Design a protein with these regions (language model features):
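Glycine-biased, small-residue-rich flexible motifs in mid-sequence functional cores and linkers
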Residues: 1-154
Length: 154
């Protein structure tokens, strides 16, 4: 797995990184625990890498962006033409890196591209935190193949 394209400070890859992954369907009671986790990571200045694609991952990104710690967004598609203004501002501060294992012509996110992106994040991260892992879901299968320790929030 390799990074094909990026925007932002590639130097962030040298930092210790925690990958945040979460099944798309998550029990309501675990959502707040994920928010608390994001706030604690922000307060400790930890570098988090995630796809920030699902609803819960976007919420985690929202909490992380309120801090000053480094953030790495891993896309399951090629780089976008235009970024959201809040991401542009963080790129200028040097605290954000957006990476992708895909060329620009890959425009749609599929289960396959998400799996490739998730494998890249797991390869790059020293630590893995899972918000929630659905039984027999894609994330459970993927994480069972990793030899890294996995911290489970819920």
């Amino acid at each position: 797995m390799e990074i094909v394209d990026h925007i932002g400070s590639i130097e962030l890859l040298k930092l210790e990184k925690t990958a945040f992954l979460c099944s798309r369907k998550i029990p309501a009671g675990i959502v707040l625990k994920c928010y608390d986790w994001a706030i604690s990571q922000r307060e400790m200045g930890k570098c988090i890498i995630s796809g920030f694609h699902s609803k819960i991952e976007k919420d985690v990104l929202h909490y992380l962006l309120k801090g000053q710690q480094p953030i790495i967004i891993a896309l399951a598609r090629g780089l976008k033409q235009h970024l959201e203004p809040e991401l542009e501002a963080e790129l200028k501060k040097g605290r954000l890196l957006i990476i992708t294992p895909f060329e620009k012509h890959v425009k749609r996110i599929t289960a396959e591209t998400a799996d490739i992106r998730n494998r890249l994040m797991i390869d790059l991260a020293e630590n893995i935190t899972a918000g929630f892992i659905s039984k027999e879901g894609n994330l459970e299968k993927l994480l069972s193949q990793s030899n890294k320790d996995i911290i489970k929030i819920g």
